[in-house]
Amino acid sequence: MENGAVYSPTTEEDPGPARGPRSGLAAYFFMGRLPLLRRVLKGLQLLLSLLAFICEEVVSQCTLCGGLYFFEFVSCSAFLLSLLILIVYCTPFYERVDTTKVKSSDFYITLGTGCVFLLASIIFVSTHDRTSAEIAAIVFGFIASFMFLLDFITMLYEKRQESQLRKPENTTRAEALTEPLNA
C-alpha cells in the first residue's frame, strides 16, 4: 500500500489538451455560418481590396493626388471592414451578439462599401497618371467593388426569400369581403 497500488485501478491520467483536426486556433474558426457563395464573395472582397490597396501603395508619384488618396483610404477601409465582418461570422463572437444585427450590419456595410469603392475607382480613373501600378489598382478596385455589390444583391435576394417564406398566404375569399354584413 505504500507504493500507491490502491489507487491504480481507478485513477486515470489527465488526457491533456484535445488533439485532433479542430484543436487550437482552428477550434475557434468556423466558416459554416455563411453559404458557399457568400463565403467565396467575402474571400474575394478581402483579397481584391487588399490587392487594390497594395497596388496603390506601390505608386511612387502622382500629379493629381486627391483621387489616389481617396482610393487609398477607401481600399484600406474596405479591406479592414470585410476582414472584421468575416471575423465576426467565423468566430464564437457571432453567438454572443444578436445575429439579426450582424446580418443587418453586414447588409449595410457591404452596400456602402461597394458604392464608395466604385466611386473611388471612378475618381481614381479620372485622375491617375497611367502607370502600371495605378492601372492594376484600378482594375482590382473595380472588381472588388463589383464583388461587394454582388454580395449585397445576394443578401437582398436571401432577404426576399426569407420574407416570402414568412408571409402567410391569403386564404380569405374575395367575394366574402364584398358581401354585406346584414344580408
Swiss-Prot record:
Expressed in the leukocytes, placenta and testis. One of its GO terms (cellular component) is specific granule membrane. InterPro entries: Marvel, MARVEL-CKLF_proteins. The modification N-acetylmethionine is found at M1. It comes from the Eukaryota. Keywords: Acetylation, Cell membrane, Endosome, Membrane, Phosphoprotein, Transmembrane, Transmembrane helix, Transport. Residues 61-67, 128-134 are extracellular. Its main location: membrane. The modification Phosphothreonine is found at T171. It is found in: Cell membrane; Early endosome membrane; Recycling endosome membrane. Residues 1-39, 89-106, 156-183 are cytoplasmic. The chain crosses the membrane at residues 40-60, 68-88, 107-127, 135-155. The modification Phosphoserine is found at S8. It is a multi-pass membrane protein. The keyword Signal does not apply. PROSITE patterns: MARVEL (PS51225). It holds the Pfam family MARVEL. Residues 33-160 form the MARVEL domain. One of its GO terms (biological process) is protein transport. Belongs to the chemokine-like factor family. Master regulator of recycling and plasma membrane expression of PD-L1/CD274, an immune inhibitory ligand critical for immune tolerance to self and antitumor immunity. Associates with both constitutive and IFNG-induced PD-L1/CD274 at recycling endosomes, where it protects PD-L1/CD274 from being targeted for lysosomal degradation, likely by preventing its STUB1-mediated ubiquitination. May stabilize PD-L1/CD274 expression on antigen presenting cells and potentiates inhibitory signaling by PDCD1/CD279, its receptor on T-cells, ultimately triggering T-cell anergy. Interacts with PD-L1/CD274 (via transmembrane domain); the interaction is direct. Interacts with CMTM4. Interacts with CD58, ARG1, ENO1 and TMPO. This is CKLF-like MARVEL transmembrane domain-containing protein 6.
